[in-house]
Amino acid sequence: MPPPQSPGWQEPAVSWLLDHCPSDYRGYPGWRKNPVALAWVAVRHIDAQLEAMRAAYREVRVDLGDLVSPQALGQIQSDLETEGLRLRASARAARLVFEALQGKRYIPRL
């Protein structure tokens, strides 16, 4: 994605945000016409996914411990952890896009 405030940066930002939402969101014209609204809902969607992964990680041993092998359980926990990390990064990035669409500038900390 090009840096915010560069010419045409919002179009790739909209595509990126839609990639992080359910595919049905591509059918709603309001999201494309109002990128800040898309970013707003994308942040909420990603946050909900992250909370679901956290809950699954907390509950997987109790809910699946008797249904899958110990090796499978370990792999499932690892997969949930990996997905949680991916979602954390996506949530941070979506928040930065949301802020950029509001005209806020990112200032890295030293």
Task: Name what the model sees in each region.
Residues S6-L110:
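Eukaryotic low-complexity, intrinsically disordered regulatory segments enriched in serine, proline
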